[in-house]
Amino acid sequence: MALADRLLEAWYRGHPALVLLRPLEALFRCVAQRRRERFLRGEGGIYRAPVPVVVVGNVTVGGTGKTPLILWLIEACRRRGLRVGVVSRGYGARPPRLPWRVTADQSAGQAGDEPLLIVQRTGVPLAIDPDRPRAVRALLKEQPLDLILSDDGLQHYRLARDLELVLLDAVRGLGNGHCLPAGPLREPAERLASVDAVLHNGAAWDPPGGYAFSLLPSALVHMATGERRPLDHFPPGTALHALAGIGNPRRFFATLEALHWRPIPHAFADHARYRAEQLRFSPALPLVMTEKDAVKCRAFAPADCWYLAVDAVPSPAFADWFDAALARLLASS
């Protein structure tokens, strides 16, 4: 097990040795608090875009289902006739220059796996740059837009925002409640009180002060042909290899089990870069992976290789809240 995986295990399941990291946690909390206070005072060269900005992010380390929810938000905005752009840090991407406009024909190595997935699914204008204000300016210079979605960036305070949406895993929650490196929190837990909405991935119903959303499988997609098959393409009890290089691979494996298949799990690091030989498993069985992994593996995927398409389904209460929030933003912009 890699060090990152060991830390995640300790943060979310507990480990007595983490107490040794408390002094570093105190330093981290101090720095995080000072950065936020500077933002609240309007210091540090904050950029306010001429259109509303909605930040979708995390206060925890580890996967929360952010990309599927962003896809849902894009479509929700489009249903209102809005022209939407997306900015992202582009973690792991190696573009020739920054900011970089992502297109559907680029490689994941050039564009980043999550940005490429978003563009391939939606065709939305998307720019990657660790300097998010610069990415926003590049998109707005290129074409007129009504709204910007920031993929992650909750802690990137140089970009002013009009709405903050935070995602939590309903099972993992806030882990041990401590900040990095003694726990999984990027900011103290009280930060949740200042955001506009908290969405709980996997919650059965809307928790107090938050909203539920689920990731529902919709189809199996063949990697080579793009053919979509219904979920009963593999009958119950089918053994298969399952590959996931995401923030929370266990959730993906549990989803396959809930579909009554028998996955042999192969977990990789989040944003892993794959080679063809890493996809050759024994015994010879179908291989099913996440869509995020598929954008990196399509060129060398084995013959019987599929990805599981999933869709974010927020609670009706959140859908109504977001629609009303958009109306307020547009009326005041």
Curated annotation (Swiss-Prot):
Q: Which organism is it from?
A: Azotobacter vinelandii (strain DJ / ATCC BAA-1303)
* Descriptive protein name: Tetraacyldisaccharide 4'-kinase
Return the EC number: 2.7.1.130
Q: Superkingdom of the source?
A: Bacteria
Q: In which pathway does it act?
A: Glycolipid biosynthesis; lipid IV(A) biosynthesis; lipid IV(A) from (3R)-3-hydroxytetradecanoyl-[acyl-carrier-protein] and UDP-N-acetyl-alpha-D-glucosamine: step 6/6
* Family as reported in the entry's similarity comment: Belongs to the LpxK family.
Classification from the root reads: Bacteria, Pseudomonadati, Pseudomonadota, Gammaproteobacteria, Pseudomonadales
**GO CC annotations on file:** plasma membrane
UniProt entry keywords in alphabetical sequence: ATP-binding, Kinase, Lipid A biosynthesis, Lipid biosynthesis, Lipid metabolism, Nucleotide-binding, Transferase
Reactions it catalyzes = a lipid A disaccharide + ATP = a lipid IVA + ADP + H(+)
